[in-house]
């Protein structure tokens, strides 16, 4: 655990980090996190390629260690925590779940499905009156985009636009883009926390994109699945006339200088914590910030 000071990153004993072997940019390595007590801290975060073949539900050990050098001449060798994918089923027979965590309303639904649109819209309207609320997308694998737009309409009482542009290369055309050259921000006096995890995919990632233009929104958890637009596109090969399906028929373009999303890597959260602990730690952080 580290804190960021005017002198740089310091560990729990007050020792200042001067370098980490192999990582010259400390600000790129150290990410905001939340301590067990609910305070903002920093941890080094590394992303590694993973196989999603069923073993992602098992615990995995990162084989890379970090050697940290301090100003007093001492060193530490850090080993990453084990990792496994998080998914939480809804209560039996329910499409949605609106619960309370330390007095904060938390809304979970695992699909953007128009068949229970009234439930999602009703929860959004109820959450719009709360000073702090959480939208739990850690187990949401996507669905219909219009459900996401309606959710934000009910929550913020206005249209919320995304920041990026989706562009189809088969054939070349815009799929979705802001209605103006400069995407308008949506005002929001309350705090909306969006919980993210590696199961957050497709429309759940579009929802996170929308949240970037909503005031006082905060993404807490892990990087997402990275499959917002990697749908397959049907094409015909010009010479053989064979019909094939190819992925990446659509590309997602972020504003120049921003790299918050990348296909197969996902969205980066504002605050990195294990998905399983995100709801509890977010509630503790909000309590400490009162």
Label for each model-derived stretch:
Residues 1-132, 139-141, 288:
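Flexible, low-complexity junctional segments that flank or bridge functional domains
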């Amino acid at each position: 655990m580290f804190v960021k000071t005017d002198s740089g990153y310091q560990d729990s004993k007050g020792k200042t980090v001067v370098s980490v072997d192999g990582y010259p940019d400390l600000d790129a390595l150290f990410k905001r996190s939340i301590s067990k007590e609910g305070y903002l801290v920093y941890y080094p975060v590394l992303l590694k390629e993973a196989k999603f073949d069923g073993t992602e539900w098992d615990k995995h050990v990162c084989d890379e260690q970090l050697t940290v050098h301090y100003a007093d001449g001492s060193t530490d060798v850090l080993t990453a925590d084990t990792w496994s994918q998080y998914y939480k089923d809804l209560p039996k027979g329910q499409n949605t779940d609106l619960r309370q965590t330390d007095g904060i309303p938390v809304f979970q639904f695992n699909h953007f499905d128009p068949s229970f649109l009234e439930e999602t819209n009703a929860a959004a309207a109820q959450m719009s009156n709360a000073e702090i609320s959480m939208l739990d997308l850690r187990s949401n694998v996507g669905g219909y985009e219009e459900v996401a737009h309606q959710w934000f309409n009910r929550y913020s009482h206005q249209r919320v636009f995304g920041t990026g542009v989706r562009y189809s290369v088969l054939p070349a055309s815009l799929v979705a883009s802001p209605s103006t050259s400069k995407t308008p921000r949506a005002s929001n006096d309350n705090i909306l926390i969006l919980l993210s995890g590696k199961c957050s995919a497709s429309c759940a990632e579009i929802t996170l994109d929308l949240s970037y233009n909503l005031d006082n929104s905060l993404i807490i958890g892990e990087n997402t699945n990275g499959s917002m637009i990697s749908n397959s596109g049907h094409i015909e090969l010009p010479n053989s006339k064979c019909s094939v399906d190819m992925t990446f028929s659509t590309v997602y373009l972020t504003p120049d200088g921003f790299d918050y999303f990348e296909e197969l890597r996902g969205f980066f959260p504002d605050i990195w914590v294990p998905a399983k602990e995100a709801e509890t730690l977010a509630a503790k952080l909000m309590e400490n910030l009162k």
